[in-house]
């Protein structure tokens, strides 16, 4: 894809349209079990709610994240498994397992979403151990083959330890830091849980309470996924709205079950709460919309462009640079490669500040010593979060000098040897 932003936008839009289509297919299957007479009406209501929340800016977050891609494979995983339950063809179970394998390597904690299927396999076949083993084998086979392929690839590149660290160990330490309140404000996380997630949890309680009564496997599995969704949210421990996106299909279908099975008074309360949550979520999204076109985000974009144009003017395409900030924005805007394997300062800060012990800052310095990037895009002022990484701040102060100043950034130039 390279740096073709238009192609990226088209790709992300196609993914969004496709997962909305997949959700509608799942909604039709589930609502038919909730109310066989009005299932088309219910499935359309669920699609309307899904499309509304799924495309709010705070949840879609530019669409370039694992949650947006994960939705497609999560929905395919569930649909494939339901297909297997209906016709018992092994192909569907293997396909479901393949989708889970993709989910797992997109983000390790997505592994939780395999538990409803594993649990259902065990419970429905517990009297026949051979069936349990065979079905678990078919479901897990793609993951094993996928893992072996990755291990072989990284083994050939002498990077197995890096692969395991980046894919699993760092994420587990990050989760611990998140729950300690060191990643994002816990207060904001709790407010969002209370205002948005909690209402959907209460809707799903009706479904979960009727777990034993529901004899339809589709509703049983939906109950399992609802429980896992809330466990997943609680385990996050940090507030980034797009983290919640992966749970939307089950929260919304839980609401539809509530819609059909609640008593009249509870139904009215539930709808009012949904309206409140919708207005709150929409208002948040509109604030981001304003910020993008006329607020701080628009101002930041102008500065980023000015900084990038300057760096581009004083470097050649083959020159390496360092952007000591979050993400890869400046590498993309300048068309210059990073002088280190690390492109975001956030990972370096977490490792150094939280004492993870990976030595990322030392590796970062070694990379810069080898590539000797001519320029560094550096935060202006001393209040930047990334000034907490004293080791890197000291390195920049000893090896670079101020070249040009912008409002939020300083361009540093490497001191001649």
Show where each model-derived region lies.
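Short hydrophobic alpha-helices at membrane interfaces in multi-pass membrane enzymes
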Residues: 83-101, 130-138, 217-227
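Hydrophobic/aromatic-rich transmembrane helices and adjacent perimembrane loops
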Residues: 236-267
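Short periplasmic/luminal acceptor-recognition loop of GT-C membrane glycosyltransferases, typified by
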Residues: 115, 297-354, 358, 364-386
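Membrane-interface transmembrane helices that cradle and orient dolichyl/undecaprenyl
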Residues: 28-31, 35-37, 75-95, 195-216, ...
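Transmembrane-helix motifs of polytopic, lipid-linked glycan transferases
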Residues: 10-36, 51-52, 76
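Short acidic/glycine- and proline-prone juxtamembrane loop motifs at membrane-interface regions
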Residues: 59-69, 240-241
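Specific aromatic-rich, kink-prone transmembrane helix
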Residues: 69-86, 92, 99-100, 121, ...
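Membrane-interface alpha helices of multi-pass inner-membrane proteins
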Residues: 91-108, 114-119, 145, 226-235
């Amino acid at each position: 894809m390279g740096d073709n932003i238009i192609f990226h936008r088209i790709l992300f839009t196609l993914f969004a349209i496709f997962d909305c289509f997949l959700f509608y297919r799942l909604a039709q299957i589930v609502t038919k079990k909730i109310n066989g007479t009005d299932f088309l009406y219910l499935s359309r209501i669920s699609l309307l709610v899904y499309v509304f929340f799924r495309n709010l800016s705070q949840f879609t977050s530019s669409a370039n994240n694992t949650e947006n891609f994960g939705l497609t494979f999560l929905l395919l995983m569930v649909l494939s498994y339901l297909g297997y339950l209906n016709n018992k063809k092994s192909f569907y179970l293997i396909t479901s397992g393949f989708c889970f394998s993709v989910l797992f390597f997109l983000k390790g904690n997505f592994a939780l979403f395999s538990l409803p299927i594993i649990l259902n396999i065990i419970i429905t076949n517990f009297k026949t151990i051979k069936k349990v083993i065979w079905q678990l084998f078919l479901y897990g086979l793609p993951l094993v083959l996928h893992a072996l392929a990755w291990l072989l690839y990284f083994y050939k590149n002498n990077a197995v330890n890096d692969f395991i660290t980046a894919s699993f160990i760092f994420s587990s330490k990050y989760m611990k830091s998140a729950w300690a309140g060191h990643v994002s404000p816990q207060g904001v996380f709790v407010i969002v849980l209370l205002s948005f997630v909690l209402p959907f949890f209460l809707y799903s309680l009706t479904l979960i309470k009727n777990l034993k009564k529901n004899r339809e496997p589709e509703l049983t599995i939906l109950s399992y996924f609802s429980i896992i969704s809330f466990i997943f949210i609680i385990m996050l421990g940090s507030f980034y709205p797009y983290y919640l996106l992966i749970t939307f299909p089950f929260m919304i279908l839980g609401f539809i079950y509530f819609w059909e099975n609640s008593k009249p008074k509870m139904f009215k309360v539930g709808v009012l709460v949904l309206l409140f949550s919708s207005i709150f979520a929409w208002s948040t999204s509109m604030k981001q919309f304003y910020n993008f076109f006329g607020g701080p985000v628009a101002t930041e974009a102008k500065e980023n462009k000015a900084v990038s144009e300057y760096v581009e003017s004083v470097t050649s395409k083959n020159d390496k640079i360092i952007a000591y900030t979050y993400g890869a924005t400046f590498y993309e805007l300048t068309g210059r490669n990073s002088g280190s394997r690390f492109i975001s300062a956030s990972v370096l800060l977490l490792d150094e500040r939280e004492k993870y012990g990976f030595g990322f800052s030392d590796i970062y310095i070694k990379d810069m010593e080898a590539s000797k990037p001519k320029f560094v895009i550096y935060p202006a002022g001393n209040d930047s979060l990334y000034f907490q990484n004293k080791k890197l701040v000291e390195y920049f102060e000893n090896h670079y000098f101020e070249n040009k100043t912008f409002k939020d950034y300083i361009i540093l130039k490497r001191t001649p040897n």
